[in-house]
Each structure stands twice: as C-alpha cells, then as structure tokens.
C-alpha cells in the first residue's frame, strides 16, 4: 500500500513515540523529511537525526525531553495533499504568538516562518510545531 502523505506519517510517528516516551523513532527517509528534521533540530525540538545508508534509507530521530516531558507539545500538519496551503510572506502564520514555529517550504528551501519572513519569501506551510 502506498503512503498518501509521508510528512503526516512522520509527524504522527514523532507524536506517538513521544507519548510512549521512546528515545528514538525510525521511518523511511526522504529529502523533505530530512529537511524538516534539520529545521526541528536547529529549533531545538529534537536532539538529533541520522540517515542510515542501507538499500532503503531510514531516518532515525532522537527525541528530546525536558524534566520528563516531551519538548514538542503539539505538532500539526497544515498543508496536505488534498488542500495545499500557500502563504505569502505577509500571510505566514505565527504559532502561539511566536512561541512556536511554522515550517515552510519555499523556493529557497525548507525553513521556519521567521527565516522566511527575514528572507522575504512565502511558500507552502507544511506544519506547525509548539
């Protein structure tokens, strides 16, 4: 069976692993998933990530906890295959008044909403993380 929305699957795996208090979660790798994992690491939401170099590459994400609670409180998919959400630089959403981040796919790569505003570019709002 083919996966319809690999990014939603990635976010669900992260959410489920954190609820189960796992330290590492693995999933099939893709360029978009690696780019999102890099943004999550740069923003401090995950401890790290690795890509295994097997026949079918796997992306392993090290989850991060603070005082026994997951660092990621909420992660939501915004743009989905059935309803893409494209926003201009002025329309990019702030998550919880700027405390969280929106991850945006732009023509300059995958970045946070703050980086997209600084670069003056809009794009597809992939997900929000708080």
Swiss-Prot record:
GO biological process assignments = translation
Keyword list (alphabetical) reads: Ribonucleoprotein, Ribosomal protein, RNA-binding, rRNA-binding
Could you tell me one molecular function GO term of this UniProt entry? structural constituent of ribosome
Listed as disulfide-bonded, the cysteine pairs are none
One short Pfam name that applies is: Ribosomal_S8
Q: Which GO terms describe its cellular component?
A: ribonucleoprotein complex; ribosome
Which InterPro entries does the record match to this protein? Ribosomal_uS8 (IPR000630), Ribosomal_uS8_CS (IPR047863), Ribosomal_uS8_sf (IPR035987)
SUPFAM superfamilies recorded: Ribosomal protein S8 (SSF56047)
Q: Which domain of life is it from?
A: Bacteria
Q: Which NCBIfam families did the record assign?
A: PRK00136.1
Instruction: Relate the protein's function as given in its record.
Output: One of the primary rRNA binding proteins, it binds directly to 16S rRNA central domain where it helps coordinate assembly of the platform of the 30S subunit.
State the family it belongs to: Belongs to the universal ribosomal protein uS8 family.
Subunit structure and binding partners:
Part of the 30S ribosomal subunit. Contacts proteins S5 and S12.
The protein's name in its UniProt record = Small ribosomal subunit protein uS8
Source species of the chain: Pseudomonas fluorescens (strain ATCC BAA-477 / NRRL B-23932 / Pf-5)
Question: Source organism lineage?
Answer: Bacteria, Pseudomonadati, Pseudomonadota, Gammaproteobacteria, Pseudomonadales
């Amino acid at each position: 069976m083919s996966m319809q929305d690999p990014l939603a699957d990635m976010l669900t795996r992260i959410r489920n692993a954190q609820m189960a208090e796992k330290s590492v979660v693995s999933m099939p790798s893709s360029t978009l998933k690696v780019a999102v994992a890099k943004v999550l690491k740069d923003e401090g939401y995950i401890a790290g990530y690795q890509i295994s170099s097997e026949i079918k590459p796997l992306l392993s994400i090290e989850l991060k906890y603070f005082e026994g609670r997951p660092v990621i409180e909420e992660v939501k998919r915004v743009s989905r295959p059935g309803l893409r959400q494209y926003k201009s630089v002025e329309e990019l959403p702030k998550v919880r008044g700027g405390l969280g981040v929106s991850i945006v796919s732009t023509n300059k790569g995958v970045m946070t909403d703050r980086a997209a505003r600084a670069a003056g570019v809009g794009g597809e709002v992939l997900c929000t993380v708080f």
